[in-house]
Swiss-Prot record:
This is tRNA (guanine(9)-N1)-methyltransferase. Pfam families: tRNA_m1G_MT. The gene is TRM10. It is found in: Cytoplasm; Nucleus. Residues 383-429 are annotated as: Disordered. The keyword Nucleus applies.
Amino acid sequence: MRFHLGLTEALQEREPNINASSKDLSLLHFELYRRSEPIMDIDEESYLNAGPSAPSKIPQGGEGDGLQGMSKKAMKRAAKQARLEEIKPLKRAAERERRRQRTAQLAEGYAAGTLSEADKELVERRRRVEKERKEAQRRIESGDQANDWLGGVVIDLGFDDLMTDQEIASMAQQLGYLYSSNRTAEKPVRTVIHTTFSPAASPRLWQRMENFNWHKWSRCHWWEQGLETLKSQLDPSTSILSVQSVVSKETQDKAGIDTKSLLSRLTGPQVPVDLQAGKHKLVYLSADAEDELLSLSEDEIYIIGGIVDRNRHKNLCQGKAEQLGIRTARLPIGTFLEMLPTRKALTVNQVFDILVKYLHLGDWAAAFEAVIPIRKYAPGRKAKRAKTETKRNEKVEEEVECTSAEGEEDIGVIEESAEVDPEDVFSNQ
């Protein structure tokens, strides 16, 4: 049986007379949830004993209706998830306040000249980024896009059903980081198309993105239609020169009042004016491709697979591209990936960052180093991380041995939310 170490210690401090049996700790874990802010009006005995073999004392109506017929383990899992959802806004507010205080401390220390070299570098880097952001916004508002790269990038979001909820949350964040990178890039990509994006096509991602003000993102286009539609639109033999944006009836039926206003921001299948049928060719970036991408051309549109899957699905993007008859290519960074001891798969925003850095620097090695500095993966750092991880695992194993008992169910580890809310990334600019 696994326990969140900090939570167990906090419980035993609050109730010093309890023994460390699994039953007592199970009750106290639930008690901490209930006392801090009740999820539902259920006493501990009803909560732990409810099930097919015992009459349920769970209140009828409201949230209790959804718990009827659930096993004890499923009820615990649902209660934990509900509690995490309740405290998420509080955690976000606390994190914002912590960042605000940290920023104020850094500014004060920088002015007084008392910061360490690392903190001083952090402050200066943040100021450079903010300056670049304001300059990029000024260029957009003034219509000055002369430095834009006239090719295109497509984020293929047609994998909603292959990701977990946590991976969907990570995907939404990566899209935010990608937009921020393009907004502040020295040579931004003029056209970024997101395909398969709507309440019907990608319901969970759509819900996540509602808080990101995606409809205000500059240089971004959002399509409900998939990659196959874009391919046909760019084919001069099948493309329609003048086409109105179309939202499917299924999507309209699912839309609420607020959602319908967002649906008007979907522009597919209208190809952006900077992309021309017969001129621009699609290239799907895939680590499994045989061809290596030697340079970037403004006559090509590069597709990045919008999926977070921890390498579960092998050859997914390669297979999809082959099925659609789209050329594939891999970034010429295999040598650099081999130098990474712990990470082989790049995130969507990292792939995009490498592209825009290459557009500015004209060198793949420099672009990769700018996005993922190799110095962070020096042998010394690797050994130190391994040692820290070993100690952490040993501590967890000791806790498990002290608290586990036969016949008890696994309470599970309370996981921190993977969400981050950097205001400079997800602003309305």
